[in-house]
């Protein structure tokens, strides 16, 4: 994990002193990416700045690297996992360090830009070849390491982060509202997306994964080229047609184990984010084969109720690894300060910022505070995208199968093609509720020609670059930590993408290839555990409630700052934002809150872009963790610390309305709803359309009958209404009376 910045003069060069002054500002803007060292290389045409986080060869690994005669200058942000093999293949070269990245300068000498085909790793690279008078900017195959650039009047500048570019006096600083508001994922549209990646800032380019930019300083010609194409890999999908499924599974296991082991190479401490799911469990298992490492888990209301935290505790115990359960409490001011959220948003530099980033930022911060020598963190990112992790989520409830998943993917692809053609055919679908136009006809004007699965994978590939890798890099870097992702070893991804069409159903439904590869490695309680979202799912309301209260803080400070300036006020109707907030406050589920937060993020970024605030790391304050020795015996205490009601309703319990609550029925029976009043004021509306049978159960609560009795009267199971009962308890609408307690004694 390091920070790059550079200036390439395309016309008459400025003085080296002036270049250094500008480069210094660009490097300082991302100093947290490299707190251990700061180096510069400047000549008449090119200036490089490097901020180093030292992980291998702590003493001598300064960059930029030069070849023997100084004609080639290289900066590398990332890790070259096969550097030892590459180094052994390079003869007659003088290596000055034992850093993994120094191998690049000599590999380029031998092979030119084709060197990149030999690398296993994650990287963004800048090469200044004085002999050819060319500069190359190179990015790894999945965009794990960031690299942005912009062309100015007489120069091209590049950096690891956008905020570094903004430090250049001539760089445009303007948020791209049109790009953000029309982004398919930001708006939540259910469509495939194969568009090039974007930065969401005007004239700032995001160098796509698997690409390099070549700048010829003799002709000033610039060209971008692909050296690795996921689409080409997918189009070769039959090249493992002759392999037996067992061989595909075993090959996958071997590659994953090798990738995890390579990701452990370090001269400093390595840690692991342990979620309780199959992905981080796999990484933890293979990592534990080689070394002991501390694991870190989010312990929140959501991860408690979806049992992620519990399974993480159990797995760490089984693997004999220390596990830190980091406590996220709803009312914790450390989490919920507008200024700290703006700090996080500026770290991320994208509207895709929310609770996931908040949780992970503080998890990194905690890890750094209690383990100061920890500089590397392993995560399970990238498994879902290529192993079929979202297949169960995307398949419809009425058809939870691979076929149902493909049906949903087809719909997403149809929506993408409609978009490409300006929605000119969508009116036919609107007439009938389904499209009479053949998907193959829509595809006839689309150059990608991908089948549904391929289209889906290409969409997730873009998502990785725009969301997963982007955030994991920024949040780790802001805490002086490098994030490593074993599932994004290109050999592993190519292996999965080579699974023949006929075997996808068996190996890519619910990540079967991963689960089956661990059959002899982990207990079935881990390998067969269903996928649960990090904080989404049935208890996402806890997280949305936390973020909602953040927006309300200090009299709606974040909303006022986001939309009061001229750029935002001309685009967003602020009064409607406040109306949405009022609506959400009355919605126990805080439905679609994340889309409101993204709009607020856009407004804040638009404002902060003009201010370019600095990013500083402060680990003097951090969240606390809970020491858990036995989950079952401590479960009640854990729930109490999380402010989760211990009053889980059971069938033998007797329910009663809170004495201050009144249920009001509308005059017309056709409305099928009731109004819930507290102390004479209507607070909630409960509609049968929204909650189904719960409406009738609520009306039948009388303080005398057990819940089982009421449920039996209506032919309803406890599972159908348990969520609504818990919500009603949390909002003090109903109380629980246990049998054999005195009259009026409730809990």
From Swiss-Prot:
UniProt binding sites for L-glutamine: 52-56, 77-79, 100
Keyword annotations from UniProtKB, A to Z: Amino-acid biosynthesis, Asparagine biosynthesis, ATP-binding, Glutamine amidotransferase, Ligase, Nucleotide-binding
Record-linked Gene3D superfamilies: Glutamine Phosphoribosylpyrophosphate, subunit 1, domain 1, HUPs
Catalytic residues as annotated in Swiss-Prot or TrEMBL: 2
Glutamine amidotransferase type-2 domain span: 2-218
SUPFAM superfamilies in alphabetical order: Adenine nucleotide alpha hydrolases-like, N-terminal nucleophile aminohydrolases (Ntn hydrolases)
Enzyme class label: ligase
Pathway it works in: Amino-acid biosynthesis; L-asparagine biosynthesis; L-asparagine from L-aspartate (L-Gln route): step 1/1
InterPro entries, alphabetized: Asn_synth_AEB, Asn_synthase, ASN_synthetase/amidase, AsnB_N, GATase_2_dom, Ntn_hydrolases_N, Rossmann-like_a/b/a_fold
Assigned EC number: 6.3.5.4
CDD domains cross-referenced by the UniProt entry: Asn_synthase_B_C (cd01991), AsnB (cd00712)
Binding site for ATP: 395-396
Nucleotide-binding in keyword set: yes
Substrates-to-products reaction catalysed: L-aspartate + L-glutamine + ATP + H2O = L-asparagine + L-glutamate + AMP + diphosphate + H(+)
GO MF: asparagine synthase (glutamine-hydrolyzing) activity; ATP binding
Pfam families given in the database record: Asn_synthase (PF00733), GATase_7 (PF13537)
Keyword Ligase: yes
Family indicated by similarity: Belongs to the asparagine synthetase family.
Protein name as annotated: Asparagine synthetase [glutamine-hydrolyzing] 2
Organism per entry: Bacillus subtilis (strain 168)
Upper classification of the organism: Bacteria, Bacillati, Bacillota, Bacilli, Bacillales
């Amino acid at each position: 994990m390091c920070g790059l910045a550079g200036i390439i003069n395309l016309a008459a060069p400025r003085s080296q002193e002036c270049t250094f002054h500008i480069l210094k500002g660009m490097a300082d803007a991302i100093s947290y990416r490299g707190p251990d060292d700061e180096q510069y290389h400047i000549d008449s045409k090119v200036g490089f700045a490097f901020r180093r986080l030292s992980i291998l060869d702590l003493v001598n690994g300064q960059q930029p690297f030069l070849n023997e005669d100084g004609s080639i200058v290289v900066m590398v942000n990332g890790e070259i996992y096969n550097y030892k093999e590459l180094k052994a293949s390079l003869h007659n070269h003088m290596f000055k360090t034992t850093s993994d990245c120094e191998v690049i300068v000599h590999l380029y000498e031998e092979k030119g830009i084709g060197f990149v085909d030999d690398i296993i790793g994650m990287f963004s690279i800048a090469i200044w070849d004085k002999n050819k008078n060319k500069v190359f900017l190179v990015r790894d195959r999945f965009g794990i390491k960031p690299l942005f650039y912009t062309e100015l009047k007489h120069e091209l500048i590049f950096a690891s982060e956008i905020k570094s570019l903004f430090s250049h006096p001539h760089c445009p600083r303007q948020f791209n509202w049109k790009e953000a508001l029309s982004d398919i994922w930001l708006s939540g549209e259910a469509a495939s997306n194969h568009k090039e990646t974007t930065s969401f800032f005007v004239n700032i380019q995001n160098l796509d994964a698997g690409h390099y930019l070549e700048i010829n300083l003799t002709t000033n010609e610039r060209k971008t080229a692909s050296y690795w194409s996921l689409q080409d890999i997918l189009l070769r999908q039959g090249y493992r047609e002759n392999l037996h499924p067992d061989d595909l599974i075993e090959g996958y296991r071997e590659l994953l184990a090798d990738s995890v082991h390579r990701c452990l190479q370090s001269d400093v401490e390595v840690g692991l984010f342990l979620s309780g799911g199959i992905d981080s469990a796999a990484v933890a298992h293979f990592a534990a084969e080689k070394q002991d490492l501390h694991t870190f888990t989010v312990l929140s209301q959501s991860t408690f109720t979806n049992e992620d935290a519990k399974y993480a505790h159990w797995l760490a115990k089984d693997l004999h690894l220390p596990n830190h359960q980091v406590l996220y409490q709803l009312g914790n001011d450390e989490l919920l300060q507008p200024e700290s959220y703006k700090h996080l948003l500026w770290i991320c530099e994208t509207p895709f910022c929310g609770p996931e980033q908040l949780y992970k930022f503080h998890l990194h911060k905690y890890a750094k505070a209690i383990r100061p020598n920890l500089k590397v963190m392993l995560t399970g990112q990238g498994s879902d995208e290529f192993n079929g992790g979202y297949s169960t989520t995307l398949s419809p409830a009425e058809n939870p199968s691979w076929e149902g998943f493909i049906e949903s993917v087809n719909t997403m692809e149809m929506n993408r093609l409609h978009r490409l053609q300006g929605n000119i055919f969508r009116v036919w679908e609107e007439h009938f509720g389904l499209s009479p136009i053949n998907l193959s006809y829509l595809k006839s004007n689309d150059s990608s020609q991908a089948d549904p699965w391929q289209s889906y994978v290409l969409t997730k590939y873009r998502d990785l670059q725009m969301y997963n890798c982007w955030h994991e890099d920024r949040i780790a870097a802001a805490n002086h930590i490098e994030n490593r992702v074993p599932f994004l070893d290109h050999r592993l991804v190519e292996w999965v993408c080579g699974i023949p069409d006929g075997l996808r159903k068996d190996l890519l439904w619910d990540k079967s290839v991963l689960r089956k590869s661990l059959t002899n490695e982990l207990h079935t309680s881990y390998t067969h555990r269903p996928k649960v979202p990090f904080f989404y799912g049935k208890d996402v309301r806890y997280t949305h409630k936390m973020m909602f209260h953040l927006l309300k803080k200090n009299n709606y400070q974040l909303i006022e700052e986001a939309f009061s300036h001229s750029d935002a006020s001309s685009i967003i109707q602020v009064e409607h934002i406040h109306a949405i907030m009022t609506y959400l406050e009355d919605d126990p589920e805080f439905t679609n809150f994340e889309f409101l937060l993204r709009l607020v993020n856009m407004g804040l970024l638009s404002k902060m872009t003009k201010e370019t605030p600095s990013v500083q790391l402060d680990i003097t304050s951090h969240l606390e963790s809970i020491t858990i020795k036995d989950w079952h015996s401590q479960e009640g205490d854990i729930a109490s610390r999380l402010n989760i009601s211990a009053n889980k309703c059971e069938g033998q319990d007797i329910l009663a309305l809170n004495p201050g609550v009144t249920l009001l029925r509308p005059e017309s029976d056709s409305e099928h709803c009731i109004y819930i009043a507290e102390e004479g004021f209507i607070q909630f509306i409960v509609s049968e359309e929204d909650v189904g049978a719960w409406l009738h159960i609520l009306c039948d609560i009388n303080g005398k009958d057990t819940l089982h009795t009421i449920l039996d009267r209506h032919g309803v199971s406890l599972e159908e209404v348990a969520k609504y009962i818990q919500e009603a308890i949390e909002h003090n609408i109903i109380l629980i009376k246990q049998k054999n307690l005195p009259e009026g004694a409730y809990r």
